[in-house]
Amino acid sequence: MELTVESLDSPALTKAQLADLLFDEIGLNKRESKEMVDAFFELISQSLVTGEDVKLSGFGNFQIRTKAPRPGRNPRTGEAIPIEARRVVTFHASSKLKEQIQEGTTGSAS
């Protein structure tokens, strides 16, 4: 049985499954497929850590945003506690991806 996104057992696509899909679709060997997937995500991670935005045309943008400090509250005790400033990753889907999701289609010609 050929592995396709539609045949996945779980609702989430894992890195291992992505590597298997590359193996099936492109013909890389399994080691090369895994290394390519790992390298792709490592490049995205490194870029975000250094503060660079990651723009994937037709897919979306990953950005680092700084959240300001704010007052918080311990839900158990009601005690006021400060929440420190922090950096968070945000993802904004491209118009093309949003359109594909609404239509239930993919960008591939299969």
From Swiss-Prot:
Heterodimer of an alpha and a beta chain. This protein is one of the two subunits of integration host factor, a specific DNA-binding protein that functions in genetic recombination as well as in transcriptional and translational control. It comes from Delftia acidovorans (strain DSM 14801 / SPH-1). Belongs to the bacterial histone-like protein family. HAMAP family: IHF_alpha. This is Integration host factor subunit alpha. GO terms for cellular component: cytosol. Keywords: DNA recombination, DNA-binding, Transcription, Transcription regulation, Translation regulation. The keyword Transcription regulation applies. It comes from the Bacteria. InterPro entries: Hist_DNA-bd (IPR000119), Histone-like_DNA-bd_CS (IPR020816), IHF-like_DNA-bd_dom_sf (IPR010992), IHF_alpha (IPR005684). One of its GO terms (biological process) is positive regulation of metabolic process. SMART domains: BHL. GO terms for molecular function: DNA binding; structural constituent of chromatin.
